């Protein structure tokens, strides 16, 4: 996530060479990287990875994950606003595939929910409800299902999601025979233990990675 901002392409190449030599073959990135987010470096990390694939011809050695961003105020990302409708997800995926110089993504993740919600403690204490229009979860899941069928993505995942959001995705996948969420990438470290409050049990009982 730092390649293209804090790290050069050459440094990124060195890190990827070292990673694969050490047997690290699951690589995760996102369309918004490098970090911190800004228009000038949007998509740069994906481009560097794609350039490495082109140089080394080792795409088939890597399990590749990337993410599409959710609701955003950044107008340079598809005009801003909600991002999980059919047109915007399809556009985001095609642009990621182009930057990554590949024709498929192994794990395609929703970087954060399209609905407005508290993330990383930004709204203070606890849950705060927002009444706002958003792309329904079922609509988003149907879009992802079509992209799985097309062969452009193999599996789907979430990121920065809540137990309620995950439960909705699982509910629809089971009721309607749609692709199932295989993983959720949430913050979990010494300072942030919120995963243990609800998501850890949910993941274990629902067999989500």
Tell what function each PLM region has.
Residues 10, 113-209:
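Beta/alpha (TIM)-barrel catalytic core signal, keyed to glycine-rich beta->alpha loops juxtaposed to Asp/Glu
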Residues 1-10, 75-90, 126-135:
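Active-site mouth loops of central-metabolism enzymes
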Residues 1-67, 87-90, 94, 103, ...:
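N-terminal binding-site loop/beta-alpha segment at the start of enzyme catalytic domains
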Residues 2, 31-33, 68-72, 109-114, ...:
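Active-site-proximal loop/turn and secondary-structure-junction residues that shape catalytic pockets
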Residues 36-40, 70-86, 116-126:
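Surface-exposed, active-site-proximal loop segments in enzymatic domains
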Residues 73-109:
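Active-site gating/metal-coordination segments in enzymes
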Residues 25-28, 106-109, 157, 185:
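Conserved beta-strand positions in the central sheet of alpha/beta enzyme cores
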Residues 59-62, 103-107, 154-155, 179-182:
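Short acidic capping loops at alpha-helix termini that bridge into adjacent secondary structure
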């Amino acid at each position: 996530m730092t390649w293209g901002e804090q790290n050069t392409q050459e440094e990124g190449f060195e890190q990827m060479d070292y990673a694969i030599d050490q047997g690290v073959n699951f690589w995760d990135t996102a369309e918004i990287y490098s970090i911190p987010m800004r228009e000038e470096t949007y998509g740069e990390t994906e481009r560097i990875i794609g350039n490495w694939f082109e140089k080394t011809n080792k795409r088939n050695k890597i399990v590749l994950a990337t993410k599409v961003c959710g609701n955003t105020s950044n107008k340079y990302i598809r005009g801003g606003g909600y991002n999980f409708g059919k047109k915007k997800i399809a556009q985001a995926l095609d642009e990621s595939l182009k930057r990554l110089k590949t024709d498929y993504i192994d794990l395609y993740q929703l970087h954060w929910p399209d609905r407005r919600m508290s993330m990383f403690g930004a709204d203070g204490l606890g849950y705060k409800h927002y009444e706002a229009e958003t792309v329904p979860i079922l609509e988003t899941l149907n879009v992802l299902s079509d992209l799985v069928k097309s062969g452009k993505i193999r599996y789907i995942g979430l990121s920065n999601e809540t137990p309620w959001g995950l439960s909705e995705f699982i509910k629809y996948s089971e009721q309607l025979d749609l692709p199932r969420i295989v993983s959720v990438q949430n913050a979990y470290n010494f300072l942030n233990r919120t995963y243990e409050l609800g998501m850890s049990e949910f993941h274990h009982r629902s067999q989500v990675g």
